[in-house]
Amino acid sequence: MRILGIETSCDETGVAIYDEEKGLIANQLYTQIALHADYGGVVPELASRDHIRKTAPLIQAALQQAGLEAKDIDGIAYTCGPGLVGALLVGSTIARSLAYAWNIKAIGVHHMEGHLLAPMLENNPPKFPFVALLVSGGHTQLVRVNAVGQYELLGESIDDAAGEAFDKTAKLLGLDYPGGSVLSRLAEQGNPERFFFPRPMTDRPGLDFSFSGLKTFAANTINQAIKQEGELTEQTKADIAYAFQQAVVDTLAIKCRRALKETGFKRLVIAGGVSANKQLRQSLADMMKQLKGEVFYPQPQFCTDNGAMIAYVGFLRLKQGEYSPLEIDVKPRWAMTELKAI
């Protein structure tokens, strides 16, 4: 079985082909960073229009990369939600149209289930059950994963997601777009001793997160530094970036440790765009070593949005006989706990 996967939930157009026997045989990705850079964030209308321009050429490129023709594809998976409604509609419409034309089944895939199962594409995939930390620009969640489709939400952010807090703090520091990754690189030059940021909601029980207060703390620290220095020096920016990043990483690690203790599990999966963060990976790897457990994460190219994870999840569900009706439908808001177990 060969599945074509299409990802258009936000500002990346991803197309991939997953083969049941060979694994991932094609992966194409176009990022819209340059398109949105002047605006300092994703403009939904521009994102949708760019998906319209890029999706079909990427499908052709993926088929060519795999050495396949349309007749060789057995099913199509597309991101149905959550995400930007216009962007989702582009991928959904193209996927449904191709499925109808090629007389094959199509299935709408949950974007975050794609991220959660992305580590399954690696040579050493995690075994069930495990705790998953899904951390991106739109989500920060801790999930108990018993099997594919058997998900229990343990905790989530009650306001800003971790990735969103990274981007907003980077903007306050005057860093280039996309700010989160720029802030992380800058933090490597920071002085660990100069600033200390709070670890929000770690002084109380529970597994929920809150990062909006951390962003406010960063803004106040920046304003104070400007009063003292006149304008922020590059070193001060790096010092603030370090303190902010360390606060986020420590907070995520503390909550992960609690979730592992609560479930009794020894396996931790980290996925989503922020899972590419080097400091987060190192911190959680050190923690799991102390706990005599295992940590898993996708390779960097599969941390951000991509078609490979959608193709893989689509394969799992289509193989079990699950498919979506012909009507074009998207779910901008969609809880992962609503998914069927397979």
From Swiss-Prot:
- Which keywords annotate this record? Acyltransferase, Cytoplasm, Iron, Metal-binding, Transferase, tRNA processing
Substrates-to-products reaction catalysed? L-threonylcarbamoyladenylate + adenosine(37) in tRNA = N(6)-L-threonylcarbamoyladenosine(37) in tRNA + AMP + H(+)
Q: Which residues does substrate bind? A: L134, V135, S136, G137, G138, D167, G180, N277
Tell where it localizes. Answer: Cytoplasm
Major subcellular location class: cytoplasm
Which interval of the chain is the signal sequence?
A: none
> GO CC annotation: what is one?
cytoplasm
InterPro entries assigned to the protein according to its UniProt record, in alphabetical order? ATPase_NBD, Gcp-like_dom, KAE1/TsaD, TsaD
* Cofactor requirements of the protein: Fe(2+)
Q: What's a Pfam family in this record? A: TsaD
Tell me the GO molecular function terms. Answer: iron ion binding; N(6)-L-threonylcarbamoyladenine synthase activity
Task: Please give a single GO biological process term from the UniProt record.
Answer: tRNA threonylcarbamoyladenosine modification
Q: Does the keyword Nucleotide-binding apply?
A: no
Broad class of enzyme this protein falls into: transferase
Give the intrachain disulfide bonds. none
Enzyme Commission no: 2.3.1.234
Q: Tell me the protein family, please.
A: Belongs to the KAE1 / TsaD family.
Summarize the protein's role: Required for the formation of a threonylcarbamoyl group on adenosine at position 37 (t(6)A37) in tRNAs that read codons beginning with adenine. Is involved in the transfer of the threonylcarbamoyl moiety of threonylcarbamoyl-AMP (TC-AMP) to the N6 group of A37, together with TsaE and TsaB. TsaD likely plays a direct catalytic role in this reaction.
Query: Which PANTHER family is this protein grouped with?
Result: TRNA N6-ADENOSINE THREONYLCARBAMOYLTRANSFERASE, TRNA N6-ADENOSINE THREONYLCARBAMOYLTRANSFERASE, MITOCHONDRIAL
Record protein name field: tRNA N6-adenosine threonylcarbamoyltransferase
Question: Whose protein is this, by species?
Answer: Histophilus somni (strain 2336)
